[in-house]
Amino acid sequence: MTQNHYTTSIFANCSKHYEFEILLETCTNSTNPCHAVSQIQSAITIAYVDYYTSVALFSIAALLDIYCLIITIPLYRRMKDDSKKKYVFLITRCISGLLLVVAWLLIQCIYLRFIAPSQDNLPYYVLALALNIGSTYVLLGSYVGMAGILYLGVLNPIAFNQHLTLRIVYIAVCIIFVISIFISIPLAIFQALMTVPTSSMSCTDTACAPLITLINFVLVFGSLITTTLTLTFVLISLCRHRKEFKKLDTTSNTSLNSAVRLLKFTLFAVLLLVAAEVIPFVISETKKKHSVVTGCYYFYHSGKVIQYAVFALTESSIWSIALIIDPLINIIFDRTVSKKATDQVKWMRKSCVGLVRKVTKRSNPENFTETSEI
Protein backbone atom coordinates (compact mmCIF):
# COMPACT_ATOMS: atom_id res chain seq x y z
CA MET A 1 0.00 0.00 0.00
CA THR A 2 1.11 3.55 -0.66
CA GLN A 3 1.35 6.31 1.90
CA ASN A 4 -1.56 8.19 0.24
CA HIS A 5 -3.72 5.13 0.65
CA TYR A 6 -2.97 4.90 4.38
CA THR A 7 -3.95 8.55 4.92
CA THR A 8 -7.42 7.93 3.41
CA SER A 9 -7.88 4.45 4.78
CA ILE A 10 -9.97 3.43 7.79
CA PHE A 11 -6.76 1.77 8.98
CA ALA A 12 -4.69 4.99 8.73
CA ASN A 13 -4.21 5.27 12.50
CA CYS A 14 -3.26 1.61 13.00
CA SER A 15 0.24 0.82 14.22
CA LYS A 16 0.37 -2.38 12.14
CA HIS A 17 -0.84 -2.97 8.60
CA TYR A 18 -1.72 -6.14 6.71
CA GLU A 19 -1.99 -6.91 3.02
CA PHE A 20 -5.64 -7.97 3.21
CA GLU A 21 -6.75 -4.60 4.59
CA ILE A 22 -7.69 -3.43 1.10
CA LEU A 23 -10.47 -6.03 1.03
CA LEU A 24 -12.07 -4.44 4.10
CA GLU A 25 -11.94 -0.77 3.10
CA THR A 26 -15.69 -0.69 2.43
CA CYS A 27 -16.46 -1.84 5.98
CA THR A 28 -16.64 1.68 7.39
CA ASN A 29 -19.07 1.01 10.25
CA SER A 30 -16.50 -0.59 12.53
CA THR A 31 -15.99 1.26 15.81
CA ASN A 32 -12.40 0.03 16.16
CA PRO A 33 -11.05 -1.12 12.77
CA CYS A 34 -7.48 -1.49 14.05
CA HIS A 35 -8.54 -3.96 16.72
CA ALA A 36 -10.81 -5.79 14.29
CA VAL A 37 -8.14 -6.23 11.61
CA SER A 38 -5.70 -7.38 14.29
CA GLN A 39 -8.17 -10.05 15.39
CA ILE A 40 -8.66 -11.15 11.78
CA GLN A 41 -4.88 -11.55 11.50
CA SER A 42 -4.84 -13.55 14.74
CA ALA A 43 -7.51 -15.86 13.32
CA ILE A 44 -5.40 -16.35 10.18
CA THR A 45 -2.41 -17.25 12.36
CA ILE A 46 -4.52 -19.77 14.29
CA ALA A 47 -5.64 -21.25 10.97
CA TYR A 48 -1.99 -21.71 9.94
CA VAL A 49 -1.25 -23.38 13.27
CA ASP A 50 -4.27 -25.62 12.73
CA TYR A 51 -3.00 -26.60 9.29
CA TYR A 52 0.57 -27.46 10.30
CA THR A 53 -0.40 -29.28 13.49
CA SER A 54 -3.01 -31.25 11.55
CA VAL A 55 -0.43 -32.35 8.99
CA ALA A 56 2.02 -33.39 11.72
CA LEU A 57 -0.39 -35.12 14.11
CA PHE A 58 -2.50 -36.90 11.50
CA SER A 59 0.68 -38.11 9.79
CA ILE A 60 1.84 -39.58 13.12
CA ALA A 61 -1.54 -41.27 13.51
CA ALA A 62 -1.27 -42.73 9.99
CA LEU A 63 2.20 -44.12 10.69
CA LEU A 64 1.01 -45.71 13.93
CA ASP A 65 -1.96 -47.33 12.17
CA ILE A 66 0.32 -48.68 9.45
CA TYR A 67 2.74 -50.02 12.08
CA CYS A 68 -0.16 -51.63 13.95
CA LEU A 69 -1.26 -53.38 10.75
CA ILE A 70 2.30 -54.48 9.96
CA ILE A 71 2.51 -56.16 13.38
CA THR A 72 -1.02 -57.54 13.60
CA ILE A 73 -1.63 -59.03 10.15
CA PRO A 74 1.31 -61.52 10.24
CA LEU A 75 0.29 -62.51 13.78
CA TYR A 76 -3.31 -62.91 12.66
CA ARG A 77 -2.37 -65.27 9.83
CA ARG A 78 -0.63 -67.62 12.28
CA MET A 79 -3.45 -67.64 14.85
CA LYS A 80 -6.14 -70.25 15.43
CA ASP A 81 -9.75 -69.36 14.62
CA ASP A 82 -10.71 -68.68 18.26
CA SER A 83 -7.94 -66.09 18.59
CA LYS A 84 -8.72 -64.59 15.19
CA LYS A 85 -12.22 -63.62 16.33
CA LYS A 86 -10.85 -60.82 18.51
CA TYR A 87 -8.17 -59.64 16.13
CA VAL A 88 -10.59 -59.20 13.22
CA PHE A 89 -11.96 -56.14 15.00
CA LEU A 90 -8.49 -54.95 16.00
CA ILE A 91 -7.42 -55.00 12.34
CA THR A 92 -10.69 -53.28 11.41
CA ARG A 93 -9.90 -50.55 13.94
CA CYS A 94 -6.49 -49.94 12.40
CA ILE A 95 -7.87 -49.88 8.84
CA SER A 96 -10.75 -47.54 9.68
CA GLY A 97 -8.41 -45.31 11.68
CA LEU A 98 -6.02 -45.10 8.74
CA LEU A 99 -8.85 -44.28 6.31
CA LEU A 100 -10.17 -41.66 8.72
CA VAL A 101 -6.73 -40.04 8.93
CA VAL A 102 -6.51 -39.95 5.12
CA ALA A 103 -9.96 -38.34 4.95
CA TRP A 104 -9.00 -35.72 7.53
CA LEU A 105 -5.81 -34.88 5.66
CA LEU A 106 -7.75 -34.56 2.40
CA ILE A 107 -10.40 -32.29 3.87
CA GLN A 108 -8.34 -30.34 6.37
CA CYS A 109 -5.10 -29.92 4.46
CA ILE A 110 -6.15 -29.93 0.81
CA TYR A 111 -9.74 -28.80 0.31
CA LEU A 112 -9.74 -26.29 3.17
CA ARG A 113 -6.21 -25.07 2.45
CA PHE A 114 -5.23 -25.32 -1.22
CA ILE A 115 -8.26 -26.31 -3.30
CA ALA A 116 -11.57 -24.63 -2.48
CA PRO A 117 -14.50 -27.03 -3.02
CA SER A 118 -16.19 -26.18 -6.34
CA GLN A 119 -18.46 -27.77 -8.91
CA ASP A 120 -15.40 -28.96 -10.85
CA ASN A 121 -14.02 -31.03 -7.96
CA LEU A 122 -17.36 -31.75 -6.25
CA PRO A 123 -17.20 -35.56 -6.82
CA TYR A 124 -13.77 -35.72 -5.15
CA TYR A 125 -14.99 -33.55 -2.28
CA VAL A 126 -17.97 -35.88 -1.83
CA LEU A 127 -15.59 -38.85 -1.84
CA ALA A 128 -13.43 -37.28 0.89
CA LEU A 129 -16.51 -36.52 3.01
CA ALA A 130 -17.90 -40.03 2.48
CA LEU A 131 -14.55 -41.50 3.49
CA ASN A 132 -14.55 -39.37 6.64
CA ILE A 133 -18.12 -40.21 7.63
CA GLY A 134 -17.95 -43.90 6.71
CA SER A 135 -14.62 -44.49 8.45
CA THR A 136 -15.99 -42.93 11.64
CA TYR A 137 -18.91 -45.35 11.73
CA VAL A 138 -16.66 -48.32 10.94
CA LEU A 139 -14.34 -47.29 13.78
CA LEU A 140 -17.23 -47.03 16.23
CA GLY A 141 -18.64 -50.34 15.00
CA SER A 142 -15.29 -52.02 15.56
CA TYR A 143 -15.26 -50.68 19.14
CA VAL A 144 -18.65 -52.27 19.80
CA GLY A 145 -17.61 -55.52 18.12
CA MET A 146 -14.38 -55.73 20.10
CA ALA A 147 -16.26 -55.08 23.36
CA GLY A 148 -18.75 -57.82 22.50
CA ILE A 149 -15.95 -60.28 21.74
CA LEU A 150 -14.23 -59.52 25.07
CA TYR A 151 -17.53 -59.86 26.94
CA LEU A 152 -18.32 -63.27 25.46
CA GLY A 153 -14.74 -64.50 25.70
CA VAL A 154 -14.50 -63.75 29.43
CA LEU A 155 -18.05 -64.03 30.78
CA ASN A 156 -19.60 -66.56 28.39
CA PRO A 157 -16.79 -68.73 27.01
CA ILE A 158 -19.20 -71.52 25.98
CA ALA A 159 -21.07 -69.20 23.62
CA PHE A 160 -17.76 -67.75 22.43
CA ASN A 161 -16.27 -71.15 21.57
CA GLN A 162 -19.34 -73.06 20.36
CA HIS A 163 -21.73 -70.52 18.82
CA LEU A 164 -19.60 -67.56 17.75
CA THR A 165 -17.69 -68.72 14.69
CA LEU A 166 -15.09 -66.80 12.73
CA ARG A 167 -17.52 -66.65 9.83
CA ILE A 168 -20.08 -64.82 11.98
CA VAL A 169 -17.42 -62.28 12.96
CA TYR A 170 -16.55 -61.71 9.29
CA ILE A 171 -20.24 -61.23 8.49
CA ALA A 172 -20.53 -58.71 11.35
CA VAL A 173 -17.59 -56.72 9.98
CA CYS A 174 -19.11 -56.76 6.48
CA ILE A 175 -22.43 -55.52 7.90
CA ILE A 176 -20.61 -52.67 9.65
CA PHE A 177 -18.93 -51.65 6.39
CA VAL A 178 -22.18 -51.90 4.37
CA ILE A 179 -24.16 -49.82 6.88
CA SER A 180 -21.37 -47.23 7.03
CA ILE A 181 -21.31 -46.92 3.23
CA PHE A 182 -25.11 -46.72 3.10
CA ILE A 183 -25.10 -43.87 5.63
CA SER A 184 -22.01 -41.98 4.47
CA ILE A 185 -22.71 -41.56 0.74
CA PRO A 186 -26.04 -39.65 0.95
CA LEU A 187 -24.85 -37.61 3.94
CA ALA A 188 -21.63 -36.70 2.11
CA ILE A 189 -23.57 -35.63 -1.00
CA PHE A 190 -25.90 -33.32 0.92
CA GLN A 191 -23.12 -31.91 3.10
CA ALA A 192 -21.11 -31.13 -0.04
CA LEU A 193 -24.16 -29.44 -1.59
CA MET A 194 -24.41 -27.20 1.48
CA THR A 195 -20.95 -25.89 0.62
CA VAL A 196 -21.10 -26.12 -3.19
CA PRO A 197 -24.65 -25.87 -4.60
CA THR A 198 -25.03 -26.91 -8.23
CA SER A 199 -27.46 -25.80 -10.92
CA SER A 200 -29.46 -29.01 -10.59
CA MET A 201 -29.17 -29.61 -6.83
CA SER A 202 -28.69 -27.48 -3.75
CA CYS A 203 -29.08 -27.76 0.00
CA THR A 204 -29.84 -24.35 1.47
CA ASP A 205 -30.63 -23.24 5.00
CA THR A 206 -34.30 -22.89 4.08
CA ALA A 207 -34.61 -26.22 2.25
CA CYS A 208 -32.77 -29.39 3.26
CA ALA A 209 -29.87 -28.16 5.39
CA PRO A 210 -31.76 -28.21 8.74
CA LEU A 211 -33.06 -31.73 8.05
CA ILE A 212 -29.64 -33.06 7.03
CA THR A 213 -28.07 -31.46 10.11
CA LEU A 214 -30.71 -33.07 12.32
CA ILE A 215 -30.25 -36.50 10.71
CA ASN A 216 -26.49 -36.22 11.03
CA PHE A 217 -26.83 -35.16 14.66
CA VAL A 218 -29.09 -38.12 15.51
CA LEU A 219 -26.87 -40.64 13.71
CA VAL A 220 -23.57 -39.35 15.08
CA PHE A 221 -24.59 -38.96 18.69
CA GLY A 222 -26.77 -42.05 18.59
CA SER A 223 -23.80 -44.15 17.49
CA LEU A 224 -21.45 -42.44 19.95
CA ILE A 225 -23.85 -42.95 22.86
CA THR A 226 -24.41 -46.58 21.85
CA THR A 227 -20.66 -47.17 21.67
CA THR A 228 -20.04 -45.43 25.00
CA LEU A 229 -22.80 -47.36 26.80
CA THR A 230 -21.64 -50.68 25.33
CA LEU A 231 -18.02 -50.13 26.35
CA THR A 232 -19.07 -48.93 29.80
CA PHE A 233 -21.32 -51.96 30.35
CA VAL A 234 -18.63 -54.43 29.26
CA LEU A 235 -15.96 -52.62 31.31
CA ILE A 236 -18.10 -52.71 34.47
CA SER A 237 -18.93 -56.38 33.87
CA LEU A 238 -15.27 -57.31 33.44
CA CYS A 239 -14.25 -55.30 36.52
CA ARG A 240 -16.87 -57.10 38.62
CA HIS A 241 -15.75 -60.45 37.23
CA ARG A 242 -12.12 -59.61 38.00
CA LYS A 243 -13.02 -58.64 41.55
CA GLU A 244 -14.91 -61.90 42.16
CA PHE A 245 -12.26 -64.22 40.74
CA LYS A 246 -9.12 -62.25 41.51
CA LYS A 247 -7.68 -64.83 43.92
CA LEU A 248 -8.66 -67.93 41.97
CA ASP A 249 -6.68 -67.91 38.71
CA THR A 250 -3.55 -65.84 38.19
CA THR A 251 -3.29 -66.67 34.50
CA SER A 252 -6.82 -65.60 33.64
CA ASN A 253 -6.36 -62.52 35.81
CA THR A 254 -3.42 -61.48 33.63
CA SER A 255 -5.54 -61.72 30.48
CA LEU A 256 -8.46 -60.07 32.24
CA ASN A 257 -6.33 -57.15 33.43
CA SER A 258 -5.11 -56.63 29.87
CA ALA A 259 -8.71 -56.61 28.58
CA VAL A 260 -9.80 -54.13 31.27
CA ARG A 261 -6.94 -51.74 30.45
CA LEU A 262 -7.73 -52.05 26.75
CA LEU A 263 -11.38 -51.15 27.36
CA LYS A 264 -10.55 -48.25 29.68
CA PHE A 265 -8.35 -46.50 27.16
CA THR A 266 -10.73 -47.32 24.31
CA LEU A 267 -13.52 -45.69 26.28
CA PHE A 268 -11.29 -42.65 26.80
CA ALA A 269 -10.71 -42.46 23.02
CA VAL A 270 -14.47 -42.62 22.41
CA LEU A 271 -15.06 -39.80 24.89
CA LEU A 272 -12.54 -37.72 22.95
CA LEU A 273 -14.54 -38.41 19.79
CA VAL A 274 -17.70 -37.28 21.57
CA ALA A 275 -16.00 -34.00 22.49
CA ALA A 276 -14.71 -33.58 18.93
CA GLU A 277 -18.16 -34.14 17.43
CA VAL A 278 -19.80 -31.61 19.76
CA ILE A 279 -17.71 -28.75 18.34
CA PRO A 280 -19.08 -28.75 14.74
CA PHE A 281 -22.65 -28.67 16.03
CA VAL A 282 -21.82 -25.80 18.39
CA ILE A 283 -20.36 -23.84 15.47
CA SER A 284 -23.32 -24.55 13.19
CA GLU A 285 -25.84 -23.60 15.87
CA THR A 286 -23.92 -20.39 16.57
CA LYS A 287 -23.94 -19.44 12.89
CA LYS A 288 -27.68 -20.16 12.61
CA LYS A 289 -28.41 -17.23 14.91
CA HIS A 290 -27.24 -14.83 12.20
CA SER A 291 -29.80 -15.01 9.41
CA VAL A 292 -28.19 -12.33 7.24
CA VAL A 293 -24.42 -12.29 6.93
CA THR A 294 -22.97 -9.52 4.78
CA GLY A 295 -19.45 -9.29 3.44
CA CYS A 296 -18.43 -7.10 6.38
CA TYR A 297 -20.22 -9.07 9.08
CA TYR A 298 -17.20 -11.02 10.29
CA PHE A 299 -15.06 -7.89 10.23
CA TYR A 300 -17.56 -6.15 12.49
CA HIS A 301 -17.67 -9.27 14.67
CA SER A 302 -14.01 -10.22 14.43
CA GLY A 303 -14.12 -11.88 17.83
CA LYS A 304 -16.34 -14.57 16.33
CA VAL A 305 -13.73 -15.24 13.64
CA ILE A 306 -11.17 -16.04 16.35
CA GLN A 307 -13.78 -18.14 18.12
CA TYR A 308 -14.44 -20.22 14.99
CA ALA A 309 -10.70 -20.58 14.32
CA VAL A 310 -10.10 -21.80 17.88
CA PHE A 311 -13.03 -24.21 17.56
CA ALA A 312 -11.56 -25.61 14.33
CA LEU A 313 -8.11 -25.97 15.90
CA THR A 314 -9.58 -27.68 18.97
CA GLU A 315 -11.67 -30.05 16.86
CA SER A 316 -8.79 -31.17 14.65
CA SER A 317 -6.46 -31.46 17.67
CA ILE A 318 -8.89 -33.68 19.59
CA TRP A 319 -9.49 -35.84 16.52
CA SER A 320 -5.77 -36.22 15.88
CA ILE A 321 -5.05 -37.09 19.52
CA ALA A 322 -7.86 -39.67 19.52
CA LEU A 323 -6.57 -41.21 16.28
CA ILE A 324 -3.04 -41.34 17.70
CA ILE A 325 -4.23 -42.92 20.94
CA ASP A 326 -6.30 -45.60 19.18
CA PRO A 327 -3.45 -47.55 17.51
CA LEU A 328 -1.28 -47.00 20.59
CA ILE A 329 -3.98 -48.71 22.66
CA ASN A 330 -3.80 -51.74 20.38
CA ILE A 331 0.00 -51.79 20.39
CA ILE A 332 0.51 -51.27 24.13
CA PHE A 333 -2.42 -52.99 25.84
CA ASP A 334 -2.98 -56.04 23.67
CA ARG A 335 -0.66 -58.71 25.08
CA THR A 336 0.17 -60.44 21.80
CA VAL A 337 0.73 -57.25 19.81
CA SER A 338 2.62 -55.66 22.70
CA LYS A 339 4.99 -58.63 22.96
CA LYS A 340 5.70 -58.49 19.23
CA ALA A 341 6.28 -54.72 19.36
CA THR A 342 8.60 -55.12 22.37
CA ASP A 343 10.62 -57.78 20.54
CA GLN A 344 10.95 -55.46 17.54
CA VAL A 345 12.10 -52.58 19.75
CA LYS A 346 14.71 -54.84 21.40
CA TRP A 347 15.90 -56.01 17.98
CA MET A 348 16.16 -52.43 16.71
CA ARG A 349 18.04 -51.37 19.84
CA LYS A 350 20.43 -54.30 19.52
CA SER A 351 20.96 -53.55 15.82
CA CYS A 352 21.61 -49.87 16.51
CA VAL A 353 24.11 -50.68 19.26
CA GLY A 354 25.89 -53.14 16.99
CA LEU A 355 25.98 -50.61 14.15
CA VAL A 356 27.39 -47.91 16.45
CA ARG A 357 30.11 -50.29 17.65
CA LYS A 358 31.08 -51.19 14.09
CA VAL A 359 31.22 -47.52 13.06
CA THR A 360 33.27 -46.68 16.17
CA LYS A 361 35.77 -49.46 15.49
CA ARG A 362 36.14 -48.46 11.85
CA SER A 363 36.74 -44.83 12.79
CA ASN A 364 39.53 -45.84 15.20
CA PRO A 365 41.88 -48.15 13.22
CA GLU A 366 44.70 -47.53 15.71
CA ASN A 367 42.82 -49.62 18.25
CA PHE A 368 43.04 -52.63 15.95
CA THR A 369 46.81 -52.09 15.45
CA GLU A 370 47.45 -51.83 19.17
CA THR A 371 45.37 -54.92 19.85
CA SER A 372 47.21 -57.01 17.22
CA GLU A 373 50.62 -55.91 18.55
CA ILE A 374 49.71 -56.93 22.05
From Swiss-Prot:
One GO term describing the cellular component: plasma membrane
Recorded coiled-coil stretches: none
Gene3D superfamilies (UniProt xref): Rhodopsin 7-helix transmembrane proteins
Extracellular side: 1-54, 108-137, 191-216, 284-304
UniProt keyword terms in alphabetical order: Cell membrane, G-protein coupled receptor, Membrane, Receptor, Transducer, Transmembrane, Transmembrane helix
Stretches of the chain found on the membrane's Cytoplasmic side: 76-86, 159-169, 238-262, 326-374
Membrane topology recorded in Swiss-Prot or TrEMBL: Multi-pass membrane protein
GO molecular function: G protein-coupled receptor activity
The keyword Transcription is assigned to this record: no
UniProt-annotated location(s): Cell membrane
Record-annotated membrane-spanning stretches: 55-75, 87-107, 138-158, 170-190, 217-237, 263-283, 305-325
UniProt entry tagged with the keyword Ligase: no
Family as reported in the entry's similarity comment: Belongs to the G-protein coupled receptor 1 family. B0244 subfamily.
Protein name (record): Putative G-protein coupled receptor-like protein B0244.6
